[in-house]
């Protein structure tokens, strides 16, 4: 489904939930700590258009399925994901202090 006015892909809730869970797996890959759901949602919002349309948010290559995209991100962009994760986590912590 696509929004007529914005041209953005709008995902049905069940598909969105599965993608959010896979993003949680991507963010927790290579870390032993539990990943905060707030960080997962912030990451998804930050890269929504690219992820929803099958593009890697780091190298902008297009992938046919979300599963292939998720595997690509985990294997090829571990450092970038970790950097994003810690930046988003710090932002969320700072908002909580204010």
From Swiss-Prot:
Residue spans, zinc finger C2H2-type: 54-77
GO molecular-function terms, A-Z: zinc ion binding
Domain of life: Viruses
UniProt KW keywords: Metal-binding, Zinc, Zinc-finger
Name of protein: Putative zinc finger protein ORF98b
